[in-house]
Amino acid sequence: MVSRRKAPRSGQSEQWVLLAPESLSGDAKNLSDETVFVKLRAPFADKGAMFLFINSGQQICEVKAFHEEYRSWFIGQTVQQDGRLLIATPIDPLFLVLPYLIKADKEQGKFQPVEQIVVDEEFPSCGMLLQCTPVAKSLHHVTEEKEIGSKKFHKYSKEKALVWLKKKVDQTVKVLKSSKVCVGGGVQSATFIRSTQGSDVKEEDYTRYAHGLISEYLTEDLREDLSKYLGLPDLSSPTPEPPVKKRRVSDAPVEADEDYTKYNSDNKSRKSNSKMTAAQKSLAKVDKSGMKNISAFFSPKAKAAK
């Protein structure tokens, strides 16, 4: 649990409930100067996201919030109105630097000091990434380097980046297998039913699943390039349905194959067109002159004129 120094009007310190790595298990007061929340540009979208810098950036975590309506926390003898659950998961900071390297390569296409590459007016705290030891140690995985005197210059290398990302995918595949995470057709995401891992699961299923996880932190272009580099075939499109079945499930009105309005004529016309029996033929020959219709016997008599 992390607490802010700023206190609201009620005098109660503002707090959150945070699930974090064990490296943050010490007293929050002792870590307040070395551990901070920083808003940076998310590598997977052109918007801000919250990250946690632990021990002056020696470890960086992505922070996500689980929030439900009408939720609060009981902390000691107090009620914390903000009922969000913050979850901090470690992330390789090179994923946060990669979009800046790609952008600089597209715009300038030359070797530059990394301090001139990782610049963002909207998120000025991005400079803190360069103070992280993991970034300095891993830049060579995704860039070409030149050293002039004591100064290093970097330029994004797509080939190196794909090799580095493939290693990330391979590591993820190993974790998926060791954790017995179901992939492929054995997963039903709607209900999250874990079925027995069948023999039909292929290595490609693990690779595609791992690629999907890694791609959440990549730009769209790099995501597609990685898919091709891994040799993942495009997912086959669904088999086209027969024309009759298409028409049945279509939202368009069903079209009749025959004009059924010809059966809408009245009974009299149908009877006249039908074949008459012998009795009906004999009755038709009888002289009906002077005969009254049977309905005439039931009609009211006309009043005589006075």
Curated annotation (Swiss-Prot):
UniProt-annotated stretches for the region Disordered: 232-285
Classification via CDD domains: RNase_H2-B
Classification via PANTHER family: RIBONUCLEASE H2 SUBUNIT B
Family annotation (InterPro entries): RNase_H2_suB, RNase_H2_suB_wHTH, Rnh202_N
Span of the signal peptide: none
Compositionally biased region (Basic and acidic residues): 259-269
Keyword Amino-acid biosynthesis set for record: no
Lineage start: Eukaryota, Metazoa, Chordata, Craniata, Vertebrata
Keywords: Nucleus
Subunit: The RNase H2 complex is a heterotrimer composed of the catalytic subunit RNASEH2A and the non-catalytic subunits RNASEH2B and RNASEH2C.
GO process terms (BP): RNA catabolic process
The protein's name: Ribonuclease H2 subunit B
Coarse class of the protein's main subcellular location: nucleus
Family affiliation: Belongs to the RNase H2 subunit B family.
Function of the molecule: Non catalytic subunit of RNase H2, an endonuclease that specifically degrades the RNA of RNA:DNA hybrids. Participates in DNA replication, possibly by mediating the removal of lagging-strand Okazaki fragment RNA primers during DNA replication. Mediates the excision of single ribonucleotides from DNA:RNA duplexes.
One Pfam family here: RNase_H2-Ydr279
Compartments (UniProt record): Nucleus
Gene Ontology, cellular component aspect: nucleoplasm; ribonuclease H2 complex
Top-level lineage group: Eukaryota
